[in-house]
């Protein structure tokens, strides 16, 4: 089964064939670290971490690079407002970013380059563009000359005449064409700066990714990814800079994830529906947030609401409960061989369907459907009078494997059998002492942990709900 990726550049699904056999070079645009990330910022790390995980599962060696923009207009503004320097603010929010995305199940990139640590190669990149005639200096600023790059607009599929008609030259800009964009910005008084051939200043946003992608992944990369909002102008400008310099294809597959809406409204500060990750993960299990995000195909918009989140949680808990019941039943099962083939064959079908979904442009929504199918099938199997250790181990292994591919964990902070038995004994003692309030409290606490008690003439029985 081959993997197919929807390529924004061609607007169609294409068979994925990396430049080098069994190796994938992948660049994902990272955050500008001037504040905590919101849930819209968190979607790309989760989506493309899942893409990476699946590629690794399929046997690819993935070089995954995701940058930090640690000098920028927003950082300078934040520094001025807080009375701190730019590096201090950047360091704080780099650390906060790692805390947030790690909680959401994202692995660290192979490399997390920072702009300020790569200033030399950025300046060299700009100088080469100037030497080739693709860029020009204007009163300390350096701009990219878009009319010199014939392919400008090919990613966003917009005619250059339309782009030029909608563009304008802002006050203070000294560019020759409204479509030209800054590669280097002359420093204003009091701003952080670096020395360059054009005077003191700092790089423009777009050139940073081009330079760092080239440094760590080479002239041509396999997959370049990011949010839908980056396709134009950021990724369009990256293509122009990189291909003008090297004369080679910059990225072979372009992937973009969709937006997030809050209660059917576009997320924005003005509407007051701005949700920060470090706030939401205090309210909800980060694993639930990830499961929710992956329950929709990455190219589609997501509507984020508490009702939908709760509904998703119910589904996730059903899968985890089935997994817990399988683990609980493991010890009481035997090494039966009769009728194993049917159940194991069905498991193989679910595995195939999961991979078919992921091979189809990483359709995690359909892949998650197969997780539900495995859980439902497992529950049916557990109704059998006699169960086989071989089959139960196969269910457990499959659920663990599929969850791991999606960056999810099945491990529940659940009570051990011995702990449950001890609480039941404590409840029995409470009933003997006519302490019915304590007895009911223990029963309710166990119910909250998905442990169902049944009082019978033979004593108290329990099961995982």
From Swiss-Prot:
Keywords: Aminoacyl-tRNA synthetase, ATP-binding, Cytoplasm, Ligase, Metal-binding, Nucleotide-binding, Phosphoprotein, Protein biosynthesis, Zinc. Zn(2+) binds at residues 29, 209, 234, 238. Its EC number is 6.1.1.16. This is Cysteine--tRNA ligase. Pfam families: DALR_2 (PF09190), tRNA-synt_1e (PF01406). It comes from the Bacteria. One of its GO terms (cellular component) is cytosol. A motif ('HIGH' region) lies at residues 31-41. Monomer. Binds 1 zinc ion per subunit. Its main location: cytoplasm. It catalyses: tRNA(Cys) + L-cysteine + ATP = L-cysteinyl-tRNA(Cys) + AMP + diphosphate.
């Amino acid at each position: 089964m081959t993997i197919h990726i929807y390529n924004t550049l061609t607007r169609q699904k294409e068979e994925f064939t990396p430049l080098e056999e069994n190796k994938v070079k992948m660049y994902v645009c990272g955050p500008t670290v001037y504040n905590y990330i919101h849930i819209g910022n968190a979607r790309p790390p989760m989506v493309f971490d899942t893409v990476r995980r699946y590629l690794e599962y399929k046997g690819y060696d993935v070089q995954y690079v995701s940058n930090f923009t640690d000098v920028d207009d927003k950082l300078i503004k934040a520094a001025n407002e807080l009375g701190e320097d730019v590096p201090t603010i950047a360091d704080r929010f780099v650390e906060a970013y790692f805390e947030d995305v790690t909680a959401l199940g994202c692995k660290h990139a192979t490399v997390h380059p920072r702009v300020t640590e790569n200033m030399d190669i950025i300046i060299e990149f700009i100088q080469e563009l100037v030497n080739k005639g693709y860029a020009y200096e204007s009163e300390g600023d350096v701009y990219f000359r878009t009319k010199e790059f014939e392919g400008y607009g090919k990613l966003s599929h917009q005619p250059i005449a339309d782009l030029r008609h909608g563009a304008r030259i802002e006050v203070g800009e000294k560019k020759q064409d409204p479509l030209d964009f800054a590669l280097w910005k002359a420093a204003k008084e009091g701003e952080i700066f670096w020395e360059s051939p054009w005077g003191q200043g700092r790089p423009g946003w777009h050139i940073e990714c081009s330079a760092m992608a080239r440094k760590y992944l080479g002239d041509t990369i396999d997959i370049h990814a990011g949010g839908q909002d980056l396709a134009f102008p950021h990724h369009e400008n990256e293509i122009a800079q990189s291909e003008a310099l090297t004369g080679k294809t910059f990225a072979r597959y372009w992937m973009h994830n969709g937006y997030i809406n809050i209660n059917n409204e576009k997320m924005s500060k003005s509407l007051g529906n701005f949700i920060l990750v470090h706030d939401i993960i205090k309210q909800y299990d980060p694993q639930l947030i990830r499961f929710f995000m992956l329950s929709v195909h990455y190219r589609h918009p997501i509507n984020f609401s508490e009702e939908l989140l709760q509904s998703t949680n119910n589904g996730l808990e059903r899968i985890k409960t089935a997994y817990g019941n399988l683990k609980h039943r493991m010890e009481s099962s035997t090494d039966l061989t009769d009728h194993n083939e049917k159940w194991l064959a069905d498991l193989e079908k679910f595995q195939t369907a999961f991979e078919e979904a992921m091979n189809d442009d990483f359709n995690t929504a359909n892949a998650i459907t197969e997780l539900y199918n495995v859980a439902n099938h497992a529950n049916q199997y557990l109704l059998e009078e006699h169960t086989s250790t071989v089959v139960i181990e196969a269910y457990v292994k499959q659920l663990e494997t599929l969850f791991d591919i999606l960056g999810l964990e099945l491990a529940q902070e659940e009570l051990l059998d011995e702990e449950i038995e001890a609480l039941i004994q404590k409840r029995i003692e409470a009933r003997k002492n006519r302490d019915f309030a304590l007895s009911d409290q223990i029963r309710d606490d166990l119910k909250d942990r998905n442990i169902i008690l049944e009082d019978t003439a033979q004593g108290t029985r329990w099961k995982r709900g």
